[in-house]
Amino acid sequence: MPDYRSKTSTHGRNMAGARALWRATGMKDEDFKKPIIAIANSFTQFVPGHVHLKDMGQLVAREVERAGGVAKEFNTIAVDDGIAMGHDGMLYSLPSREIIADSVEYMVNAHCADAIVCISNCDKITPGMLMASLRLNIPVIFVSGGPMEAGKTKLASHGLDLVDAMVIAADSTASDEKVAEYERSACPTCGSCSGMFTANSMNCLTEALGLALPGNGSALATHSDREQLFLQAGRTIVDLCRQYYKENDDSVLPRNIANFKAFENAMTLDIAMGGSTNTILHLLAAAQEAEIDFDLRHIDRLSRKVPQLCKVAPNIQKYHMEDVHRAGGIFSILGELARGGLLHTDLPTVHSKTLAEGIAKWDITQTDDEAVHTFFKAGPAGIPTQTAFSQSTRWDSLDDDRENGCIRSVEHAYSQEGGLAVLYGNIALDGCVVKTAGVDESIHVFEGNAKIFESQDSAVRGILADEVKAGDIVIIRYEGPKGGPGMQEMLYPTSYLKSKGLGKDCALLTDGRFSGGTSGLSIGHASPEAAAGGAIGLVRDGDKVLIDIPNRSINLLIDDAEMAERRTEQDKKGWKPVESRPRKVTTALKAYALLATSADKGAVRDKALLDKLVP
């Protein structure tokens, strides 16, 4: 049986000094025989998805200690992508993922913790903690802060979210009063933004990976039911420690739970629910930490056979995460996928011996358990608040309509191909990604004229100045992991295209990425990126580009000889923006750019380069 990792710092005469320090934190003699559980919290007052997490660590800690463990809490950083967006702050968002992963590794390894409870929520925090967990490979469970309630206003017949506020603000016909009303109403409570944006997508995927409890991705931050997830996480992590350290059962380790098949399950769910394209980036990064051969080829294969079973904002205005929960949450989507033969259900999870057992217990269409049905009736109260567990509103009924409801069966899918696709072609030899769930079917094949911008800032100025016309394909380059650096999100350009009435008349291609709030024909992650010699850097104003989603292709319509001639010319000039960019690139960002890979590798550090630099 493996020894507790913490024994390194708690046993032996030579550790008297370390024990003295442990005692100064409150530990007693009997505690040195127990597992030390690291609680990786991410509370901050900067981020609405994390503003309510201040007391969550101690809530979990008390339950850990009741169950026989020793809990020690620390915090990671957390960047709010929405607040950081539209200015140089967005350069720091993706690099913060690596900082979060490293900080968890540093704290856990420096103090020899035996297991981790990851309290995450928003865009880069869940992926960063996931990367660290798979890197460390010790018992772990994820419990997130939960989704925000959708906003309500008399000026709109549908629920509001952050994107609605951005779009209306860019609409020159909207009055200041209307903009102010949307702004005040769009984000009414604590929690991660209310649609199927990156944060909620990733929290849902932790359920499919087997590393979180059912309801983790969908139970509202404000609802009293969510408290039980935190309490259960505290009990579960101690049990996972017992199984591994006392019973020598390594099936509970994250690399054995989140194995290749589990990554396929997570991606299958992502495609079926039309999740954010950022999830592809983060799953690729996490797979590398787990040393799993999972790449865009696998995602491309899955995208061709998995139907879209769920549509949520920003892909449709009718539904938000509160509606997904009412329809049975993630385990009901998994149940439909399993019935369609699209899941590996023989895999372990942190809460069930197999995923099949979990689905049987938690899919509302399979179980008669009234407690499960009551749990999924938890709904929004419509009261602005920053307080967790502050309301206990319930719907009168569940949404179990699998023909026309929020969650559909395979037979009644929104579409027989899923909500994400990988495109290849001479403009993106290593691939690029598009959220097809947000693309009108009429423009799944689109040929247009390239309109080149060498930064997001210049693209925004150009769109607002009406330089972009119907039929254009906006190309924003040198915004990849190296070129940005930091691979900015392009929510403002896509939102402004919509506000200009060009949402169905234009496309956008970038080596940057998109917010989970993006919809429209928005293609990101073009790899290799321009700064790494990618062909997106060879496109010129007015070039014809053909996008063909059904055939999974994207091509610059010039011949090979012309492409080769342009490449030779660009090699002489150097792969950098033509226009100067008033952008301060700090030492921290330069360090990230030096080691960053393109998006097809998850924008992680180049480990081969690192091994050369530090053998």
UniProtKB/Swiss-Prot annotation:
Specify whether Iron-sulfur is a keyword of the entry: yes
GO molecular function annotations of the record: 2 iron, 2 sulfur cluster binding; dihydroxy-acid dehydratase activity; magnesium ion binding
Which residues does the annotation say bind Mg(2+)? 81, 123-124, 489
User: Which Cys-Cys disulphide bridges does the record give?
Assistant: none
GO cellular component, alphabetical, reads: cytosol
Cofactor binding notes? Binds 1 [2Fe-2S] cluster per subunit. This cluster acts as a Lewis acid cofactor.
Which top EC class is given?
lyase
Q: Which cofactor does it need?
A: [2Fe-2S] cluster; Mg(2+)
What SUPFAM superfamilies has UniProt attached to this entry?
Answer: IlvD/EDD N-terminal domain-like (SSF143975), LeuD/IlvD-like (SSF52016)
Please list the residues that bind [2Fe-2S] cluster.
122, 193
Q: Which GO terms describe its biological process?
A: isoleucine biosynthetic process; L-valine biosynthetic process
Functional description taken from the UniProt entry: Functions in the biosynthesis of branched-chain amino acids. Catalyzes the dehydration of (2R,3R)-2,3-dihydroxy-3-methylpentanoate (2,3-dihydroxy-3-methylvalerate) into 2-oxo-3-methylpentanoate (2-oxo-3-methylvalerate) and of (2R)-2,3-dihydroxy-3-methylbutanoate (2,3-dihydroxyisovalerate) into 2-oxo-3-methylbutanoate (2-oxoisovalerate), the penultimate precursor to L-isoleucine and L-valine, respectively.
Q: What is this protein called?
A: Dihydroxy-acid dehydratase
Q: Can you name the source organism?
A: Pseudomonas savastanoi pv. phaseolicola (strain 1448A / Race 6) (Pseudomonas syringae pv. phaseolicola (strain 1448A / Race 6))
Q: Which gene encodes it?
A: ilvD
